[in-house]
Each structure stands twice: as C-alpha cells, then as structure tokens.
Amino acid sequence: MKNIKNILSIVLLTFLLWGCEDFLSVNPQSELTQEAYPTTAADALQSTNAVYATLRDWHYHSGGFPILDIMSDDAHKGSSPDDAANTVGPYDDFTHSPTQDGLDRWWNVLYEGIRRANIVVQEVPTIEMNENLKNRYLAEARFLRGLYYFDLVRAFGGVPLVTSPEPELQVPRASRDDTFAQIIADLEFAAETLPPKSEYGGDDLGRATRGAAQALLARVYLFRGDFAQAESYAMDVIDSGEYGLEPEFVDANGQDGEHGIESVFEIGAVATGSVEGNQYANTQGVRGTPNRGWGFNRPSIDLREAFAEGDPRESGTIIELGDVIDGIEILGDSSTPDEMTDEQGNVIQIESYNRKVWIPGTSTNTQFGHNRRLIRYADVLLMAAEALNENNQPVAALIYLNQVRERARQGNASILPDITETNKDALRDIILHERRVELALEGHRFWDLVRTGEAPDVLGPLGFTEGKHEVLPIPQSEIDLSQGTLTQNEEW
C-alpha cells in the first residue's frame, strides 16, 4: 500500500552509502533540490515531507546508533575486529573524543532536520490553503523538531536553539532547561493539533499522530524525572484505545507489524536501496551466510543472560548461529567471531546478531526496507508503569507491566509469571529490567541507565566515567566553526 514512505521519494536526496568500509565516514547528503520557500499547498506538503526525510538520512538512522546501544551493556561494536575500529570502536569502550569521526555528522543531520522544520513553521502559515491541513503540517513539523531537539539534548545537554531557517551564524548554547522548554512547547502543540492514528490511512499512513506526540512527551518527562507529567501523557495514549500489543513479539519490530497496532511512530522505508530505503538493518545484518549485512551492534553476553529462562523474547532479539529463520540457516562469518571473557576469565567465541532487524530477502542489497520503530506501545506501557510506581501507585503500575509480560510469555503459563511486588524500590528495579529485555537493541538502554543514575555502576566496568560520559562531547569542528561561541561540555 502506498503511504508516506513512498511519498518521500519526491524529496530528492543523494543516498551515498554502499559499503561498510565507509561506516560513519560518508559525506553529508545533499540539500533539497528545490531550495525556494514554499508558496503553494503542494509546496507545503513537499516541505513537510522533507522534514520526515531526515529520519532516513544515513547519519540519523544508522550513523547515530553507536551512540545508543553500543554505549550500553546490551551490545558491542561487532563486525570484524578491524572494521570501523577507529570510528565505531571508541564508543564501545568510552574512548571517543570531541574529534570523533561521525559525531559531527550526527549533530549536523539533526540540525538539518530542524532547519527543514523551521521552514515549514515559518512559511506555511502564509500560504492560502485548507486551514486544517495547514495546521496539521505545522504540527507535524513541530513534532519532528521536538524529536530532533530531544535527540540533541539527551546526547549533548543544552544546545543552540534555532527556530528560524536563517539564524545568525554563531548561536550560543541554550541551557538544558531552555532546550527542554522548546521541546515541550513543540510537542504540546503537536499533541493538541495532530489527528489520532485511526484518522490516517493510505498516503498518510506513518505520519506523526496525536498519540506519537503524547508518547514522546511521556518519554521527555520521564527523562526529566517529572513522573506526574510522564504518567499523564502515557495514560493519554493508553486511554485513547488507538494502540495495542502485537500477538507475536517478533512482529513488534518485523515487517508484519509495520504501521500495526503496536507502532506509535516508525521510520518508513522500502527495499529499493534508494532514497525510499535505509540501511539500518543492513548495518546490523548477519555477516557471512546468509550475507544480510555488516554485523555491527552485536548483542552482548550480558544481554543474553538478562533474559529469564524460556523467555521467547531472547530468540526474538538475538540471532544465534544454527538458528533457522524463514527457512534460512544462520551460519554467520566464522572468520570474525566475537571474543568475550566470562566471569572466570575464560575467553569464549560467540557470534550473534540483532534479530529485530531481520528482513526476509536474498542478499545485502535487499536489506533497505526495515521500518525502524521509534516508539512502540510496549514502551508506552512500561513508561506508564514506571511513572505510576514513582507516583506511589504500585498496584496500577503492575497492570501495565504485566500486560507486557503476558504478551511475552506467548500463552505459556509456566514462564514469566505476573509480577506482584509492590515495594517501590524493588518494583523500580523490576520495571527497569523489563524495559531492558523488552526493548533491547532498540536504542533505549543507555538513556535508561543515564536517567536512572545506574550508568556508573552498570557501565563503569566498560569505561564509563561518572560526570563525563552521561553526555557526548560537542563536536570540536562545530566549536571551531563558531569561533568559540559554542562551549564544550565539562570534563570533555
């Protein structure tokens, strides 16, 4: 069915990444071919689509993931030992620096998305067109601007606030609080203005919705430690009745669940290897046989051991050698196994991959059609559970926590029993663990550890330094371009 992932092909971008030797080192994508500001309803649509197109930029969907899972205890660099050792490897052991290759490109692609959103916000109000559609475009742009700024503030702290397409050349950093205030204002406007998911269809399937804005607000407030607001927005999503859990866990991230009942917001893509696709799955796919990708972002032994015995989510998250998926036996690349050291100091060789990016196909050139889920309903349920527990409502929290576990057990009553714990501290730990095994390799774990204060204890053995590694360094190239207007994060 035609939908927004197909529509975005009208926004012509140069898609330049074709080999893993270029990982995190390709040139930024080109600008929109039509730089003139929008003046018609058709222009307004194209300009709004361009804001979404940033989601499929290499440096957003794949260039940014080392800053997510690889910095956590859920994954490590993967691929072969020498592949991207100097680009991705430093994120694995916290030896990255302000001049780290790729860091500036992630920063720049987020600001490019913001620039495109600013064009819509500034110019579309002046266009004579249907007012309801005009307001929807504005809300979509502000939702995406809020998303991009949230990515920035989590990663770097307070950042330059740019709300016009042509800002001053040297913009100082705003405070962290002011950055969050802009994010919340954008997302509140989106939540008040956007239609619910059920009102979209056909060409508009996959656009930002009221539920997506509310869910992102819940995530923002949870990161801020404002549990009252996090509870309120998570419950808005739940009470809307627009969402549910896929019956099968693998469908929550697989092709059969694209734009499905569990998807609150996802990056649409098609398997063409062109501007309609992305390489998020390709970068993490199985090396060797059946040759589905480059094998980055490999699950850690620690993640494997986090799953309870018999939890079906383990096989729905981790591909092991010898697994048979869609009739294909996974043999991997025996020449590049991962060498890990167990608690007894023994070196063991393990080769495993991210099951959540598996796509049926025949070669690496077909692995462009993965719709990456940015917000799942299971995440919303767990955000609600966490917020309710922090707000001294443990019994209510258990309702939503156990909904996630019920789906996970897949009808097997002998595993994953309902949680009954109501002690606040104990339940907090249980919910954080449930987030880990439910949302593994989806880019949440590092931020969960940072916001809960668990990062020093959990990641310290991997190289994490408290007071430094909660944020990334501001790219040195950006500080140089600003002639010192931008200041570096402390300890960096």
Residue ranges and their predicted role:
Residues 45-59, 81-156, 173-177, 187-199, ...:
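Conserved, well-structured interaction surfaces
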Residues 9-18:
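Bacterial N-terminal signal peptides
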